[in-house]
Amino acid sequence: MARNKIALIGSGMIGGTLAHLAGLKELGDIVLFDIADGIPQGKGLDIAQSSPVEGFDASLTGASDYSAIEGADVCIVTAGVPRKPGMSRDDLLGINLKVMEQVGAGIKKYAPNAFVICITNPLDAMVWALQKFSGLPKNKVVGMAGVLDSSRFRLFLAEEFNVSVKDITAFVLGGHGDTMVPLARYSTVAGIPLPDLIQMGWTTKEKLDQIIQRTRDGGAEIVGLLKTGSAYYAPAASAIEMAEAYLKDKKRVLPCAAHLSGQYGVKDMYVGVPTVIGAGGIERIIEIDLNKGEKEAFDKSVAAVAGLCEACINIAPSLK
């Protein structure tokens, strides 16, 4: 049986980390693509030279021509400009929208049957634009946001409670930005909801609110510390979890920026919601009940994403 083919479009810090993780997990043969000739080839060669030490069998190649991604089973898109200190994800919109147009055309021509995971910021608007530019089925184009945001939330909760990260489940809904909605009510430690843990004296509402805010600021905290770029280890690990769910038909329940067609009262937008990912791509959108406060926060997040999509249409009217 032929190996799967994974195309990594963008060979920066996330792209290189994706290639290494995909190799370690033996998810398939890997093509690193970047318009900056030499970088994908160099990173591909470097990671390939680690394979005898790490003990994985995968072909790693680099390319600067879209023809190299032909027939890819999965495309993970990180191409674009990352954040720098003082920038919001939204500040990147104009530059990265043009990148999505080129990437969409490349995928449409060479990998129309791929499952496409977008990481480029501002995420919810970029994945929406990428789907339109590529013309791929909406269930086969998804944004990586909720897995990362939930992972940050889970880590901070594990540190607060001094328990294993494995015993914490957490959900973050909404856009991948300052308006994201970490849901305490649907987040648990070994099945015990966070509100119950407050009553049990494990933490306080004030402390939990601080953790929720730190989750919202998770990316900005790292940007501020690095000063020259943004997070890449955790975003790459999050996208690989999604790719693996698709390639191995795992039916994983993962929060992702998925295309909504009426769910949660949202139409023709990509917003972070719980989904089931299997061989069919996004196989199901899970609609959970939101209370009044949660619904208001979610609607505020949706409105922020809608504003970004409108800004995209102003720049590229063909998206309408």
Curated annotation (Swiss-Prot):
GO molecular function: L-lactate dehydrogenase activity; L-malate dehydrogenase (NAD+) activity
Keyword NAD: yes
One of the GO BP terms on file: tricarboxylic acid cycle
Cited Pfam families: Ldh_1_C, Ldh_1_N
Group of enzyme by EC: oxidoreductase
Reactions catalysed: (S)-malate + NAD(+) = oxaloacetate + NADH + H(+)
Tagged with keyword Transferase: no
Disulfide bonding pattern of the chain: none
Family, per entry: Belongs to the LDH/MDH superfamily. MDH type 3 family.
Name of the protein in its database record: Malate dehydrogenase
